[in-house]
């Protein structure tokens, strides 16, 4: 029994000495042969808002827009409570876009007017205001409220020029052209589309080419119907 106890004590002492030798910052031998081990504590904490966003995006991808909207709303509330106002505004615009997709124009409008725009005005985000104007232009166009749509697309274009954002400016030109097509102002719409083509080429924005072609096709079809 005594021999066993002594053996155990010797084993523990030996291992303790080896451990001390390995981690000793003053050991010259170890300094040259062993890499320094720095244990970095990586935070894996995910906020409740981020979790809601992940679930919302999954629901959206699965086609469950109502479920996605509900989760996006929860995420928006969390971001607002955490004072992450840019994220809060972005989620609000996302909610509005999904409501627009559901043709729920009134609620889509209210989300932007009563929440997103107020948020961006409060934090002084002109870019956020510009994107809010774009969303309202789209909502009013879909709801056939063309005067309101024209006004917001125009405001979007003004801000885009001030912020030197050619992509968003081109988007506003196309939005206005689509309104003029719907109002059967075909000559004016044709001029806007020609201008849009020139802007896309000058600003190297080929991603708008397909949209321009679609608008031109609609213009041709509608103008033939008129004649």
Task: List the predicted regions and their residue ranges.
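Intrinsically disordered, low-complexity regions
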Residues: 1-227
């Amino acid at each position: 029994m005594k021999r066993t106890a002594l053996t155990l004590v010797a084993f523990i002492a030996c291992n303790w000495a080896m451990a001390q030798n390995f981690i000793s910052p003053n050991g010259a031998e170890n300094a040259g042969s062993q890499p320094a081990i720095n244990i970095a504590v990586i935070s894996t904490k995910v906020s409740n808002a981020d979790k809601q966003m992940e679930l919302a995006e999954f629901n959206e991808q699965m086609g469950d827009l109502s479920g996605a909207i509900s989760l996006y709303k929860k995420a928006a509330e969390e971001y607002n409570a955490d004072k992450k106002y840019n994220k809060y505004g972005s989620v609000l615009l996302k909610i509005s876009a999904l409501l627009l997709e559901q043709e729920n124009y009134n609620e889509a409008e209210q989300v932007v007017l009563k929440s997103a725009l107020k948020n961006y005005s409060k934090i002084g985000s002109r870019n956020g205001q510009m994107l809010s104007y774009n969303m309202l232009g789209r909502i009013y166009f879909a709801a056939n409220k063309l005067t309101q749509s024209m006004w917001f697309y125009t405001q979007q274009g003004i801000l885009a020029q001030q912020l030197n954002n050619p992509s968003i400016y081109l988007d506003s030109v196309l939005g206005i052209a689509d309104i003029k097509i719907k109002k059967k102002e075909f000559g004016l719409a044709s001029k806007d589309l020609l201008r849009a083509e020139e802007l896309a080429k000058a600003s190297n924005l080929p991603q708008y080419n397909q949209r321009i072609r679609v608008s031109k096709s609609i213009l041709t079809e509608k103008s033939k119907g008129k004649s």
